[in-house]
Design a protein with these regions (language model features):
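AAA+ P-loop ATPase mechanoenzymes
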Residues: 1-182, 186
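Pre-Walker A (pre-P-loop) alpha-helix and adjacent loop at the N terminus of AAA/AAA+ ATPase modules
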Residues: 173-208
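Conserved helix-loop functional segments at active or binding sites
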Residues: 193-204, 226-230, 252, 281, ...
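Short loop/turn elements that form and flank the Walker-type P-loop nucleotide-binding site
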Residues: 202-204, 231-232, 256-258, 290-293
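Walker A/P-loop
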Residues: 206-236, 240, 249-254
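Conserved catalytic/switch belt of AAA+ P-loop NTPases
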Residues: 251-255, 270-307
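Walker B catalytic acidic pair
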Residues: 265-267
Length: 308
């Protein structure tokens, strides 16, 4: 079975919709096939994809993190011939599968008279734009997409949170824009300038945004993300209670070709707190070396002369 032989893009087999489709293709016997059919259709409907299976399957491939997408996201212009052959074969299979209609599957199914069952049917729709056209052009389009947008979940999402020892995407991030914020323009501009320097590969600093509640500290970070994510900026919120996990977090992003702000909100600077000791260790390099693709932005409304 071709889908089982995916190599570079085999990561899509772990995703919900492709996995359900794979089980349908492998189903043997009438009962197993009908169960797999019903499950696949339900999965599509739950995600609002009942009319666009091709877009879903090819989109899953577009956002897959693999040897090709990582290399392209890192700026590679040339790739090993063997890798390109693997990519070409995988994309050909994915495009063929995305074009299969319910009628195609029923024709090769173990069901004797499928028309009498009136099974629910989905629409195929069209592949994502990057996978429309000649296959070699599609590979070039995919590579360009990765160079411009990154790969994996970092291409699909802009905001993340550290939870359960892993980086998890935020599907619906705060939509605040810089133009929405009023007051403290000088201080905000300093944070903006520092962030722009970071994105341009120039020297930049970790930032502590401090002041009374309601002065726009957290909103500034969220607004900068919405302003600059097309330029490769991503934000990972790290709960202050998880600061001891900092080495684990930076290990997971060190090789990702994006720029990350590690955002720590509402810090307390009492020397008796664990967060104070943990942040001090992070900033002084006691826990892990912070990779060049990351900065720490923290906010606090508790700061005195002794901490400046």
């Amino acid at each position: 079975m071709k889908m089982a032989s995916l190599s570079i893009y085999r990561g899509i087999l772990k995703r919900t919709v492709p996995a359900a489709f794979y089980r349908l293709l492998r189903a043997e016997g009438e009962e197993e096939f009908l169960k797999a059919w019903g499950n696949f259709f339900a999965v599509l409907c739950e995600r609002g994809l009942s009319e666009s299976f091709a877009d879903c399957l090819t989109g899953t491939a577009l956002f897959d993190e693999n040897a090709f997408s990582l290399a392209a996201a890192g700026g590679a212009q040339e790739f090993p011939p063997a890798l390109l052959k693997g990519v070409e074969r995988d994309l050909r299979i994915i495009l063929e599968l995305s074009a299969l209609t319910p009628e195609d599957l029923l024709y090769d199914s173990p069901i004797d008279n499928p028309e009498t069952l009136h099974l629910p049917a989905w629409g195929t729709g069209n592949p994502v734009k990057a996978l429309q056209g000649a296959l070699k052009d599609c590979i070039a389009s995919m590579a360009n997409y990765y160079r411009e947008n990154g790969c994996g979940m970092y291409a699909r999402y802009r905001a993340f949170i550290w939870r359960d020892s892993s980086i998890q995407p935020v599907a619906f991030p705060d939509k605040t824009r810089l133009s929405d914020l009023k007051g403290y323009e000088l201080q905000r501009q300093m944070a903006i300038d520092n962030t722009l320097a970071f994105l341009e590969g120039l020297p930049a600093n970790n930032c502590l945004l401090y002041g009374d509640r309601g002065t726009g500290k957290s909103s500034t970070v969220k607004a900068m993300l919405n302003e600059f994510y097309p330029r490769g900026l991503r934000v990972i919120e790290m709960p202050k209670e998880s600061l001891m996990d900092f080495p684990k977090l930076v290990d997971q992003i060190a090789a990702i070709p994006m720029k990350f702000i590690i955002f720590i909100d509402d810090l307390s600077f009492s020397k008796e707190t664990d967060t104070y000791a943990a942040l001090k260790a992070v900033l002084e390099g006691g826990l892990a070396v912070r990779p060049e693709n990351s900065l720490i932005y923290a906010t606090s409304n508790q700061i005195g002369r002794a901490h400046v």
